[in-house]
Amino acid sequence: MAAKDVVFGDSARSKMVEGVNILANAVKVTLGPKGRNVVLERSFGGPTVTKDGVSVAKEIELKDKLQNMGAQMVKEVASKTSDNAGDGTTTATVLAQSIVREGMKYVASGMNPMDLKRGIDKAVAAAVEELKKISKPCTTNKEIAQVGSISANSDSSIGDRIAEAMDKVGKEGVITVEDGKSLADELDVVEGMQFDRGYLSPYFINNPDKQVAVLDNPFVLLHDKKVSNIRDLLPVLEQVAKAGRPLLIIAEDVEGEALATLVVNNIRGILKTVAVKAPGFGDRRKAMLEDIAILTGGQVIAEETGLTLEKATLAELGQAKRIEVGKENTTIIDGAGEAASIEARVKQVRTQIEEATSDYDREKLQERVAKLAGGVAVIKVGAATEVEMKEKKARVEDALHATRAAVEEGIVAGGGVALIRARTAIAGLTGANADQNAGIKIVLRAMEEPLRQIVTNGGEEASVVVAAVAAGKGNYGYNAATGEYVDMVEAGVVDPTKVTRTALQNAASVAGLLLTTDAAVAELPKEDAPMPGGMPGGMGGMGMDM
């Protein structure tokens, strides 16, 4: 095991604080509408230009081990805030730096770090309650667009696109972000349920222009096993042919004789069919087949439920108004399932979301809810160059997370104003002793830091603006984009409550840990062994007799 370097007390803390400051100073230049860009080097290709706090934080690794520990702890603040609320990473970093800076002064003067932390925690809890009180619900399209615009660095076109997407697919709908092919942003909305499986044979195509198979008013056969023997399918195919309607077969796989027969029938015009593989794998495949069954009002033909293909009747088949099958996707529009059954299924999946432990599972379950309840919208980001597209795509994703957070917990005045107003809840707060009171003061000072940084990035005098905003009431604040004092909510400068709350809680959590640190253990840098003496050996035997 390698030898370790153990550093105690102020020596450990001061080095870690240096790391905190290096990271925070790089991140905080991006805050606000007049925030600056940060250029990130890439080992391959051109550099990346960004105004996203968490992207900057993730790139920073420091040479000094102790400094790097401090930087990594604040990086955790940015990452956690981004994971929980989707935005507010720069605000969280600025708050953490301020709490650490002010707290270190008190620790150096001999105050008890544990009591300081208790005071900080008490103040943050009171501020969070106040934020919840002053929060207002975010319901209208205009408010959703405003939240998206602010989060995308005051780009109103992004806010409008997100509001339009949410309007089309509902609050529960899935909205994804992809690279576009043109200069302008585009919005594609897929109504109904779409899953990523296409036709098993190109001979099923009946619309050559679009290269898709379109089925109007079809039956839907759902089976959880492979279908390779046509005899299994014959009874149900005869019933569908009598009804004179097309058929979509969704099974684990359709192959061999069964697939060949379906293709021949399709080409000859005897029976219009399309076969696709079932989406997902394992247990998720079963669940998705069940979702499709409920959406189309059919049943999954599985041995577990006592149903077999040979005995299947039209009653077990699902139905839909229209189905489009492409090379890679299948879209079921207007399934014939009962609204009550669909609602019950959505409720069931929502319960699973609450119980899910991994982010991946939660995301997949959320997608299932969206496919059952609303639809899927795809925002295609357009830009002139790849560098610009990457930067813009990151901003759109940020804005999307922020709007979801706003719909969830409501909105407060942006531009650092909400934190200034929440200070009123802490102003009269007292701790159990003088050290806890100092902790409360630390948070009071830190809560004006985001506004100070926004104003500083805008090139104005921070102290003057902070005093003017603090003297005002309600949503009165400073709009750094225009340089005017306005009602922030009316001006459309708003933040999701969840973002502001999460930023404050995460910043206080990590800053408290730093303040109460009294020793740091790091690996000693390895010393490379010197090269052995003497000339390196040459290559013998290269002479040639002429």
From Swiss-Prot:
It comes from the Bacteria. It is found in: Cytoplasm. Residues 534-546 have a biased composition (Gly residues). The keyword Cytoplasm applies. ATP binds at residues 30-33, 51, 87-91, 415, 479-481, 495. It is an enzyme of class 5 (isomerase). Pfam families: Cpn60_TCP1. Keywords: ATP-binding, Chaperone, Cytoplasm, Isomerase, Nucleotide-binding. InterPro entries: Chaperonin_Cpn60_CS, Cpn60/GroEL, Cpn60/GroEL/TCP-1, GroEL-like_apical_dom_sf, GROEL-like_equatorial_sf, TCP-1-like_intermed_sf. The keyword RNA-binding does not apply. GO terms for cellular component: cytoplasm. Forms a cylinder of 14 subunits composed of two heptameric rings stacked back-to-back. Interacts with the co-chaperonin GroES. Belongs to the chaperonin (HSP60) family. This is Chaperonin GroEL 1. The gene is groEL1.
